[in-house]
């Protein structure tokens, strides 16, 4: 009898975790006048079928001591609704049968996924609490086209891959299963058997919306409905965002490593939670006059020393900072304070942690199979195969999810240069040319265009900004995709950063020989739309902090940094400054330590902080300093060739004719009567002086104002004699 209820071949295949189609034998299967019910429940003592009201419908006999059960129940017309009453050694469990449910995902959404629609990834993959046929549970779906078998495992089944093998939906390669009786908060992973028969290490869900806190590695079922129904209060912000001309408004970005911005030393040096960061970071950013906060990657990452740049869960805010809805609360409060939120996002590569994406289904699924394409030589990580339709859709869906679910205002795309060149950091013979024999990565170009079109299109909330960290001269990074560009809104100006930092590192007596480093950036300043980045990358790995790069004694170093900040904030391009630099921290960035806030007890460091605050406020208040950041009409040199005195002067303007003139003296020698051409006659007010006493300077200057007289100089009809403070920048504005 039992042989007819449960075929031996099915029993053996299920217990070995090799059955190609568990739904073909498990669950209810009709026979004349009755229904055969089969279940695999290793460790169960007995199993009974009950009606929803609790009446016994039949007993499932143990047909194999390893945990296979089968029995019959009455048909009673249509397909019966039954429950399984499972007697475990220590308790009875009454649940719906996972194998009594039909297919879950619509064929159309699976077709969209296979065609590369990022929105389809959000619609079908991951773990989603659901109610199906009046039964609550979780719908699991994962892409693993080359696996022989996929099971979902978790606390709910003792992490036993025999309990919940999934259904393969051909031809999409997506596996699905509805597990009744569980919900948000459950830990889970996937157990996969590769095509060659290997059982792989348990894998986290690539599309998990939540995770355990490291070093634990399980995915966590998120309350998706609650996240989607989050009570946002930023309607005004979201409505106004696309209506602001992002290129004409001030951008001053405070770059933050969320894990270390303000640790809690009395609690084992833990990171602050999102709610704690909202209480402390948002008022700080607002008070300092920054317009945006940019987080180094916050998608879950196993290794803290990667600073987030080796993520394993592209859709999940790291559990280091508390529940995922805490990040939504942070963004909501930031918007209420008038602060935009950007996140660093990593589509170039991923770590090879065994629970992650590497060899996900036993094959190079997310990465390239050829190590000349699939292994990154600098970071020893796996390179995403963005040319594969489903992988490109997966990544773009991640960016889309941050914009949709968490209202982030933009993403900064990491390591774009490494994606664009097939020979990036590779020697001859270690890379594969493209189809035309060249070094350009055509698949990455297509992916980046698709990404930007997605985030700038109807699928995303209006007004999302994309920023490229691209360190080469690749043309058209910020040009529209329709014109052959990559479609980014802004690009980090790495050349400007390298050149100008190299200049200020020089002893003042030698700066005359490196004068062009400060002026060369204007040759190409308007070829792209730029952000001027003084980022975390410049204050790690032995490079020294910004102030530590400067030569001279402590006073000269601080003065040079102040002068450099004055030059930067007046220079065309949006601004970015890494945490700790705003008060001239001496130490390099350390991910396991907090910035040295105690330095603010010293007047000199408070002065630098006050300067950055005032630079931000003045930059935002003066349209001349930001409205034409991306247009050559907004800039003109007044003095660009006085290398002997290491003096620079230039004018910034907007379309309405507002003017600001910046004059920089990068020597410790005060200039008592230095003539500077000015674009307008009359009184010019001293708008900014980085040598002012409140900033820690000597208070040398021009008593608040100068008069432009009809003496031609530097191509202008008017000029003024100025006192230039040592190692300082002045800003002047017509009174």
UniProtKB/Swiss-Prot annotation:
Protein name (record): 1,4-alpha-glucan branching enzyme GlgB
Organism the protein comes from: Burkholderia lata (strain ATCC 17760 / DSM 23089 / LMG 22485 / NCIMB 9086 / R18194 / 383)
Pathway in which the depicted protein is active: Glycan biosynthesis; glycogen biosynthesis
One Gene Ontology term, aspect cellular component: cytosol
Record text on subunit structure and interactions: Monomer.
Keyword Kinase part of the UniProt annotation: no
One GO MF term attached to the UniProt entry: hydrolase activity, hydrolyzing O-glycosyl compounds
Key words of the record: Carbohydrate metabolism, Glycogen biosynthesis, Glycogen metabolism, Glycosyltransferase, Transferase
Keyword Glycosyltransferase applies: yes
SMART domains attached to this UniProt entry: Aamy
Cited NCBIfam families: branching_enzym (TIGR01515), PRK05402.1 (NF003811), PRK12313.1 (NF008967)
Family: Belongs to the glycosyl hydrolase 13 family. GlgB subfamily.
General function of this protein: Catalyzes the formation of the alpha-1,6-glucosidic linkages in glycogen by scission of a 1,4-alpha-linked oligosaccharide from growing alpha-1,4-glucan chains and the subsequent attachment of the oligosaccharide to the alpha-1,6 position.
GO BP of this protein: glycogen biosynthetic process
Catalytic center residues: 414 (nucleophile), 469 (proton donor)
EC annotation from Swiss-Prot or TrEMBL: 2.4.1.18
Catalysed reaction equations from the record: Transfers a segment of a (1->4)-alpha-D-glucan chain to a primary hydroxy group in a similar glucan chain
Annotated CDD domains: AmyAc_Glg_BE (cd11322), E_set_GBE_prok_N (cd02855)
Lineage, broadest ranks: Bacteria, Pseudomonadati, Pseudomonadota, Betaproteobacteria, Burkholderiales
InterPro entries (UniProt xref): A-amylase/branching_C (IPR006048), Branching_enzy (IPR037439), GlgB (IPR006407), GlgB_N (IPR054169), GlgB_N_E_set_prok (IPR044143), Glyco_hydro_13_cat_dom (IPR006047), Glyco_hydro_13_N (IPR004193), Glyco_hydro_b (IPR013780)
